Amino acid sequence: MSSKRGGRSSLAKAPEEAVNGEAFAPEASPPPPGDDGDAGGEDGGAPAPPPPPATKGGPVAVGRSLEIQTTPDVCMEMLADKLKLLNYEADFCRKKKPYRKPLSRLYFAVPLANSSEQFFYFTSLATWLLGLAGVELPAPKEFDDPNLTCQNILGAVKKLGFAPPSYHPTKLTVGNGKEVVGVLDGLVDFVLERRHHKYSRPAYGNDGQPEEGVQLDDEAEAAAMEGADELAMPAQNQADDDEEEEGVYVDPGRGDAAGPGTGASAAMDAEKAVLVSKVDPTLWKIELERVAPKLRITIAADSKDWRSHLDEAHQHKEVISKAWPDSKTSLERLRADLNGTLEKLQTREKFLNEQFESLMQQYRAARTTFTDVQETYNRKTEAVADRNQEMHRIGETLEEVKAMMDEKGSNIADATPVARIKTAIKQLNKELHDMEVRIGVVSHTLLQLSLRNKRLLQAQAALSDEEED
């Protein structure tokens, strides 16, 4: 089920020949289902060797490619089947709410209307697969920077021993296409290999169908219909025929089957008694004549029928057999030329790897420095975002204080309360003046009354003195 992958870059191959002291072993492709007849000869062939075992302490293989050679739709169909082997529907789709829908067989192969949702599904699935592969990556968020998220995913994939892709990380931001399918397919293959998953040949059960190559021609169909017509014969005649056939197979050493003293004869008679039909032959024949036309099946000629395909296959086989001797020499010469060219390419590749080894080391150091600077930049960006949020919060508080000050200032600048206070003071002064006048009048009245009372008392005292004298 593994898809065909492109070779890695020639410059990136040699520096990554081994990880943790293990040499690179090319990925063994499992045999395609249904090809066990021709791949291994007449006996079905030996099963393909299993993929190399995974190493617990590091990457399984080095120099894997993230680029596919098949079309995205074909690779996506195989990717959906591989994800089912990892039980992603339970472990990924239904791990937390809201639940995700399982992938269709063309989800990442074609663009969808909601590209942001498609990209978020890709980043979440890639992060989950990286976690299964042993690389912890923070869970992506829906509104994260797409370019930064894609760079983080490719950086984590590179730690597993994958060769750097030839395309730019921004190709992954669209959320679909061969680049996205290639990344997911490579990660799924890596996880399956890490779990020591082995592909086995499919087991086909015997469903009672005729094997390929067996043709039911018109003569066989006619013979079958004749067999159906023979059922219309009387049951008694059939019983007689059975008796004749049984008479032929009588064992001479045991005597006649009808002779006395033989147990086989009694058992055979009992069997015959069971097999004798009690149906009226005439009614049987009438019923058969009524039902037989309904049981006849006429198979129309179809260009898509397997018989026509088999005939075409035989014709193609004959054409290939005739053309093979002439083309074999040309193919052998072409193979020799290709082998020579491959040897030259390998020699040239080794020379280039040795020549650019120092540049590759400088490139790795520059990439490491760039990664550190990028992380520092991300931290600074987060700090700036926090400061901006704090500045916005302080600005909102300042606006509220300004509004309160403006309200107080407007109240202070308003002269209406002062005028009211002055009017009230004048009214109070007037009332105080009136009260003082009234108090003076009352005091004068009291003074007069006290003087009058004093005179009366003096007069009474004088009268009382005179009376005493």
Swiss-Prot record:
Belongs to the IFT57 family. Required for the maintenance and formation of cilia. Pfam families: IFT57. InterPro entries: Intra-flagellar_transport_57 (IPR019530). GO terms for cellular component: ciliary basal body. The keyword Coiled coil applies. Residues 239-248 have a biased composition (Acidic residues). Gene3D superfamilies: 1.20.5.300. Residues 1-60, 233-264 are annotated as: Disordered. This is Intraflagellar transport protein 57. Signal peptide: none annotated. PANTHER family: IFT57/HIPPI, INTRAFLAGELLAR TRANSPORT PROTEIN 57 HOMOLOG. The keyword Membrane does not apply. It is found in: Cell projection, Cilium. Residues 326-440 form a coiled coil. Keywords: Cell projection, Cilium, Coiled coil. Component of the IFT complex B, the core composed of IFT25, IFT27, IFT46, IFT52, IFT74, IFT81 and IFT88 as well as associated subunits IFT20, IFT57, IFT80 and IFT172. Its main location: other.
